[in-house]
């Protein structure tokens, strides 16, 4: 008897580590729901396990709410086994210096906190029931 297919939700999936994470879980036959500000490359979407991509700006609370609603509609009654918060931002100054407490604008810091802290918090809360059903984990 085979195990039911597990489902992963991954943010920041359009390139780099996110794209590699999709490949890793796809090779293990997980169904994958992704989110990024940009559409992923077309060759990625040919993967049969990459089942649903939602374009969303996770800095914006309304966009997150819309994303959660659409993803939950796609999930239906199925459980969620993993939420990987890969989307993030670490801006640099014009001289390639990382944002620090003595440099950078407060608006940049607000954006960093919205994306790197509040978005994962909102997503964990938004998918809590689906994650509980799947005994899922949040990364």
Show the residue positions of the predicted features.
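Conserved Rossmann-fold cofactor-binding substructure of NAD(P)-dependent oxidoreductases
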Residues: 59-76
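Conserved glycine-rich cofactor-binding loop
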Residues: 14-15
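Substrate-binding pocket helix/loop in short-chain dehydrogenase/reductase
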Residues: 94-101, 105-110
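Active-site loop of short-chain dehydrogenase/reductase
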Residues: 5-6, 77-81, 131-139
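Hydrophobic positions on the long internal alpha-helix
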Residues: 67, 84, 123-127
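Conserved glycine-rich Rossmann-like NAD(P)H-binding loop of the short-chain dehydrogenase/reductase
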Residues: 28-44
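Rossmann-fold cofactor-recognition segment
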Residues: 47-62
């Amino acid at each position: 008897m085979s195990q039911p297919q597990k489902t992963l939700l991954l943010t920041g999936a359009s390139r780099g580590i996110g794209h590699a994470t999709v490949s890793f879980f796809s090779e293990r036959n997980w169904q994958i729901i992704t989110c990024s500000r940009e559409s992923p490359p077309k060759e990625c979407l040919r993967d049969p396990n990459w089942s649903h991509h939602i374009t969303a700006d996770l800095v914006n609370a309304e966009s997150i709410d819309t994303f959660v609603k659409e993803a939950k509609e796609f999930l239906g009654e199925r459980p969620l086994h993993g939420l990987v918060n890969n989307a993030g931002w670490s801006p640099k100054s014009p001289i390639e210096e990382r944002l620090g407490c003595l440099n950078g604008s407060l608006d940049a810091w607000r954006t960093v906190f919205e994306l790197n802290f509040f978005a994962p918090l909102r997503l964990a809360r938004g998918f809590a029931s689906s994650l509980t059903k799947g005994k899922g984990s949040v990364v």
